[in-house]
Amino acid sequence: MSVLTFFRRRPPRHSGPKRVLVPFTGGELDPVVLDAAIRVAQAEDATLVPAYLIVTPLEYALDTPMQHEVAVAMPLLEAVEHAALRAGLAVDARVETGRTPTHALHRLWDAERFDRIIAPAPAGGGHGFTPKELQWILVHAPSETLILRPDPTLAKGFRLARTLDAVA
């Protein structure tokens, strides 16, 4: 897994539990990224905030219900919630709309505070944020941001010599 970390400025200290935002779009969240986000939230004793970002086309009003997108988002958010609850984490799932994924993120950042943001980068041509969107996230994020990109060979089902058995 590749990790890119960008420190913008030291976020102001807030009272209350820490919050780790994991935004995703495109109908999937890579399980490797989810596992890493859960481990980070556990280490920081934080609430995991998975956020499904819905892109609303220009021909619709921004607050138009996107029933098909919500039908895709809810099972994904439930799966993330179950995984986090099994790990003993508090979960506060979100669905946010916008004209683009970055617009939806901006709307979410304006409404709530987050102590850390973990954004998934696509592996092997999968769904997710584009390189341009990831760059925007790094520049505009209000708190410490990690970009996680799973090993593309793992996405294809190939295991490289990464286990102790393979190395020995």
Regions found by a protein language model. Give the residues of each.
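Structural beta-alpha unit
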Residues: 1-13, 86-117, 122-123, 135
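Aromatic/hydrophobic pocket-lining residues that form π-stacking "cages" and hydrophobic walls in ligand
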Residues: 37, 80, 105
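Glycine-rich, Arg-bearing micro-motifs that act as flexible, cationic patches
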Residues: 118-141, 154-158
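Conserved hydrophobic residues forming the short capping helix/wall of the S-adenosyl-L-methionine
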Residues: 41, 80-84, 109
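A conditional alpha-helix N-cap/helix-loop micro-motif detector
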Residues: 30, 73, 98-99, 127
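Short, well-ordered secondary-structure micro-motifs
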Residues: 33, 60-63, 104-106, 129-130, ...
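Short, surface-exposed alpha-helical segments at coil->helix boundaries
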Residues: 66-78
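Small/aliphatic-rich secondary-structure junction motif
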Residues: 9-67, 92, 140-151, 164-168
